[in-house]
């Protein structure tokens, strides 16, 4: 039982849900570029590099957030909060993972992906985690940029080129993350307020946040349509994505009448997961 608990604690520090979400996005971007030709070796190298680099960022984020994690109710039981003496070890493990991931990327994938991974890591750790998360409401927007790079890495691992399609993917995934993240902020509003973290709902309130969520869902909807035409993805993708985005938008508008903001945010969050999961699956297998 002791060893099971140790493994669970280690997995918690790596934030496996975030890694899995990033892997799925990488596969979506890969699928858009590969157009039905799945190269298993390249996909494996992409996945391994992402696991190491994103895992490294997640571990360091745990270290950086120790001071606020001990204040928020939902994070008080995290490993590095309870056992602060492991922080130095966590930093060493994170730096080793980063080094190994970047070496794999530059040696076996390409320099474009290496630069994208490094840019995402630096943005997430220094600009987002160290500075903006605790000082500014725009932290979510900056975090969305680093969070939207995995699908670009998947795309560029095939094309070895950052083009207009990869730029649209970047915009599309960044736009998706805003309503997704704002919904999380509403759901955990009390924790963020107690910890004095200036997330958008805390600074501007629920009403303005709701309108921003709706606006970003509409912009995301447009970016998905643009992707269909600039990359010539088949119309099966367009039809399915149209109904998915329309449903997400419908719930965001319908739920405006609900006075319970957390119930509204819960539905927005749930649909954000459904939409991005299914879109990535279609992007990966849409050409097969």
UniProtKB/Swiss-Prot annotation:
It is found in: Cell membrane. GO terms for biological process: heme O biosynthetic process. The keyword GTP-binding does not apply. PROSITE patterns: UBIA. The chain crosses the membrane at residues 6-26, 44-64, 89-109, 111-131, 138-158, 169-189, 213-233, 238-258, 268-288. It holds the Pfam family UbiA. Gene3D superfamilies: UbiA prenyltransferase. The keyword Transmembrane helix applies. InterPro entries: Protohaem_IX_farnesylTrfase, UbiA_prenyltransferase, UbiA_prenylTrfase_CS, UbiA_sf. It is a multi-pass membrane protein. It is an enzyme of class 2 (transferase). Pathway: Porphyrin-containing compound metabolism; heme O biosynthesis; heme O from protoheme: step 1/1. One of its GO terms (cellular component) is plasma membrane. Keywords: Cell membrane, Heme biosynthesis, Membrane, Transferase, Transmembrane, Transmembrane helix. Belongs to the UbiA prenyltransferase family. Protoheme IX farnesyltransferase subfamily. HAMAP family: CyoE_CtaB. PANTHER family: PROTOHEME IX FARNESYLTRANSFERASE, MITOCHONDRIAL (PTHR43448:SF2). Carbon 2 of the heme B porphyrin ring is defined according to the Fischer nomenclature. This is Protoheme IX farnesyltransferase. It comes from Buchnera aphidicola subsp. Baizongia pistaciae (strain Bp).
